[in-house]
Every structure is written in structure tokens, then in C-alpha cells.
Amino acid sequence: MSKKPASKDTLGHRLSRATEINITVTGRKSGRTISLPIWFVWEDGTLYLLPVKGSDTQWYKNVLKKRTMRIDAGGAGAEVQAVPVNDATQVKSVVEKFRAKYGSGDVKKYYSKFDVAVIVQM
């Protein structure tokens, strides 16, 4: 996680154009860094993440243990603080944002549990 951070403008521009980002979290048991591609929504300086299996998603469980994570989009990246959300109204709002961006069919196809989300203020 030692890459040089991108300026917020560069990262924001990349996020506004991307359909997928890479996140890097720290394993809650192993302590190792784990990177994986995920879908996201970028809106008004806020990054919304929806774990595919909700609270059963491994990267989400890792974020509960250590809130610092790295996001990378098109060569720009930054370390950020993740805010886990389990309020049903807030989670529903994030799910609707995902449906608007990716389509209801794909969200239904790939996401199996809608009990949590993650919000990152940039």
C-alpha cells in the first residue's frame, strides 16, 4: 500500500469514468493485504460500495476490523477510511444507486444479500 496517492481531482475524474475499481484491504486474521476488483458508485465526492454477499462478504469483514483501505481507479489511487453502514434505509439507498448505474438485472444476478454497505467520503 505504498503507492503515491493521486490528487483528489485526478482520482475523482477516474472514478467518474470507471465501472470497476480495485480495493485493497488488510486481512483480519492474516494481516496481509488483499486486493480485488469491485463495482462502486461515485456521486458528489462520495464513494458507495456494496458487498456482493452483504455482511458475509470477506472484504467487508476485513473492513470491520481495519477501516483503512486503498482504492485504485485507472492508475490513480488513495488510502481512504471506510464507513460500514447497516442502517436499512441507507443500505437501500446505496442499492438503488447500484441499480441505477449497473441495471436491476445485473445487481440481482451478482448480489445476494443487501444488509450492509460501505461509504467513503473523499
Language model region names:
Residues 1-20:
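Extreme N-terminal tail/first-helix region
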Residues 11-13, 48-61:
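Covalent nucleotidyltransferase core used to form phosphodiester bonds in nucleic acids
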Residues 12, 27-29, 109:
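Residues embedded in well-ordered secondary-structure elements
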Residues 18-52, 69:
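Short beta-strand segments
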Residues 54-122:
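Short, structured beta-strand-loop surface elements
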Residues 1-7, 28-39, 71-79:
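Short low-complexity stretches enriched in small and charged residues
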Residues 16-18, 33, 64, 113:
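Short, solvent-exposed coil/turn segments
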